[in-house]
């Protein structure tokens, strides 16, 4: 895919600035299609498609969790691991305000506000991951090691979907 065939988002600018190699994938976005939609379109395992989930704690402070597409986050376990009382999903408006991205197009790269990033630890064992590139219908493929540029903290909070 040539450079002219995919969007240049804040995430792409971030990846380029860090000299991170990535493979762009553009697909037909479908409202509420989630990671399963991309996995189906690209013929990739949904387990390797990583969700970027924006959450907030009891103090209304934002955080991001990167999770396998075929798993859910145990917010109870996450709160325990982080020493917090309560964690819940951020509203779509709040997530957009913090990240600069629309829900369905949220990337952990190039966020408007630097939020703490937490990575489900089993993601590191994958050979390749597919994560949102900062726009609905746009995914970037890369090695999981590239997530280290986000200075993430490992967590173990995945539960079966």
Residue ranges of model-derived segments:
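Extended, low-hydrophobicity, polar/charged segments
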Residues: 1-161
């Amino acid at each position: 895919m040539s450079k002219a065939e995919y969007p240049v988002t804040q995430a792409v600018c971030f990846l380029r600035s860090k000299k991170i190699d990535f493979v762009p994938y553009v697909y037909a976005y479908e409202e509420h299609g989630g990671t399963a939609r991309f996995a189906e379109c690209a013929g990739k395992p949904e387990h390797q498609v990583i969700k970027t989930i924006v959450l907030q704690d009891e103090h209304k402070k934002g955080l991001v969790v990167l999770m396998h597409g075929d798993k859910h986050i145990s917010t109870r376990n996450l709160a325990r691991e982080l020493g917090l009382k309560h964690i819940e999903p951020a509203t779509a408006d709040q997530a957009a305000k913090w990240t600069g991205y629309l829900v369905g197009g949220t990337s952990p790269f190039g966020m408007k506000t630097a939020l703490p990033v937490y990575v489900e630890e089993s993601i590191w064992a994958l050979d390749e991951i597919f994560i949102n590139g900062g726009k609905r219908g746009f995914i970037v493929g890369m090695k999981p090691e590239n997530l280290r540029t986000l200075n993430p903290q490992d967590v173990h909070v995945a539960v079966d979907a």
